[in-house]
Amino acid sequence: MRQKRIAGMTLVELLCALAVVLLVSAGMVLGVSLAVRSYERSVAGSEAQVLCSTLETIVSDELRYAGTLKYDEGGKVVGFFSQNHPDADNQQSEFTTDDEGRVLLGGQKLLPNNAYPHGLRASVELKGYDKETRIFTAVITVTDRGGDTLAQTELQVKQLNKPADTPQG
């Protein structure tokens, strides 16, 4: 009788072992990529909350000490005099957003570029102003590259300085 060879593997056994190793490796690569994507999403969400909170502090300080107000044709406040971020002609400043999603006041950045990690974008919108109580209402929105909202807050700030109103325009 013939005895089986004990040493070594046959070609079929080698191919089966290689297929198992490849399947396990592919599963690990997929798992790691999903974990990295989930981690990046989580970090971006946390950074969005930090950015929103930081902008909330800066915007509330600016609105609290706002001077002369600027109204549009509909009577809505669109700008104000800011001592910290005056417009180029020292008139009323407005909250705007540049092409990269950085918040500007009077054409000047409120925060440095590295305050917007992971491609975060932000905007500030003045929703209203109550002349009797001198309370501003503003909305701060932080989005990702794709425009999905990651953080948003609405704040109400009482203006300390009694403003001298300016005409529309």
Features from the language model and the residues they span:
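Aliphatic-rich helix starts adjacent to a transmembrane/signal segment
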Residues: 2, 6-61
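Short beta-strand edge segments in extracellular beta-sheet folds
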Residues: 156-160
